[in-house]
Amino acid sequence: MKLEEATCGCAAQTKPGRKAVAVDPEIKDSNLKRLRRIEGQVRGLQRMVSEEQYCAEVLVQISSVQEALRSVSRELMRNHLQHCAARAISKGTREEAAAMYEELLDLMYRHAR
């Protein structure tokens, strides 16, 4: 399957008029694998709290989960910028480009927190 024919990993279908563009199937598989690993880490955290393990150890594991989520987030953002945003800005209407700029600003503000 060509990259252009794939669907984007973003939630483009949740907004009327938005079209998903592309995601590399290998990136999608990699992100899903990472998310499953994170899910396992979170289950481990639940067990640690349930078993009243030492707070510092729990906090170290929480930090590990947060970094893993940031890694997935960066990969999704990269894909969104390279495909969805690039297409909306270069080939979309002025309104679509403006909406994409607003969306990107919102995403940057959210990730900067």
Describe the residue ranges of each PLM region.
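Solvent-exposed interaction patches of small proteins and small membrane subunits
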Residues: 1-113
